């Protein structure tokens, strides 16, 4: 995982509420264990017609969405089953942060383990983002703030360990492995 301090990007806005993990990446794409290439399956049933052609009216298929790394989603994003493929698909598609008023706990935990920043904002700040698709936004992980299109900032919660991992580019296992020598010394002293 790469360290994440600040994400600056235009936003792509997906105002649908209760987007579940099966909508993020349908079950038929879950037969792989490699994260690479899953971005093509992101929102597949909404992005592509039955013949596989891109639907030009879907927000992520529009030219202005290209290169955006911040997804502004409706309330209760990532609900449904535990599916680590969902954050894998988002990250593989270039999304670095998801902003909503509520993000499902299991999705949030999976996102953090995979370098995707889950940002929960108050309703008023979120409404400003929903009303300004394509606006430039800054997510500051270190300060735990989002700079909104009007220049104001909104704070978002992030527990200390998750913040540490994002800022240092490590996941939980990487953190534990980095402590291996200290753990061995502690265990050796107990014998």
Swiss-Prot record:
Keywords: Amino-acid biosynthesis, Branched-chain amino acid biosynthesis, Leucine biosynthesis, Lyase. HAMAP family: LeuD_type1. Heterodimer of LeuC and LeuD. It catalyses: (2R,3S)-3-isopropylmalate = (2S)-2-isopropylmalate. GO terms for biological process: L-leucine biosynthetic process. GO terms for molecular function: 3-isopropylmalate dehydratase activity. Signal peptide: none annotated. PANTHER family: 3-ISOPROPYLMALATE DEHYDRATASE SMALL SUBUNIT (PTHR43345:SF5), 3-ISOPROPYLMALATE DEHYDRATASE SMALL SUBUNIT 2-RELATED-RELATED (PTHR43345). It holds the Pfam family Aconitase_C. InterPro entries: 3-IsopropMal_deHydase_ssu, Aconitase/3IPM_dehydase_swvl, AconitaseA/IPMdHydase_ssu_swvl, IPMI_Swivel, LeuD. It comes from Anaeromyxobacter sp. (strain K). This is 3-isopropylmalate dehydratase small subunit. Its EC number is 4.2.1.33. Catalyzes the isomerization between 2-isopropylmalate and 3-isopropylmalate, via the formation of 2-isopropylmaleate. Pathway: Amino-acid biosynthesis; L-leucine biosynthesis; L-leucine from 3-methyl-2-oxobutanoate: step 2/4. Belongs to the LeuD family. LeuD type 1 subfamily.
């Amino acid at each position: 995982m790469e360290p994440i301090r600040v994400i600056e990007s235009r936003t792509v806005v997906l105002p649908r509420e209760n987007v579940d993990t099966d909508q993020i990446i349908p079950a038929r794409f879950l037969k792989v264990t490699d994260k690479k290439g899953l971005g093509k399956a992101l929102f597949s049933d909404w992005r592509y017609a039955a013949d596989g052609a891109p639907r030009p009216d879907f927000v992520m298929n529009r030219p202005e969405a290209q290169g955006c790394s911040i997804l502004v989603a409706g309330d209760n994003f990532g609900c449904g089953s535990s599916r680590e493929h969902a954050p894998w698909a988002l990250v593989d598609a270039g999304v670095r942060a998801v902003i909503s008023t509520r993000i499902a706990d299991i999705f949030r935990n999976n996102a953090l383990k995979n370098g995707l920043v889950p940002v929960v904002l108050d309703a008023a700040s979120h409404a400003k983002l929903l009303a300004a698709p394509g606006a430039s936004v800054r997510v500051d992980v270190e300060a735990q703030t989002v700079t909104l299109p009007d220049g104001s900032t909104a704070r978002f919660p992030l527990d200390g360990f998750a913040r540490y991992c994002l800022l240092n580019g490590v996941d939980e296992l990487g953190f534990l492995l980095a402590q291996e020598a200290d753990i061995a010394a502690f265990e050796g002293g107990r014998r």
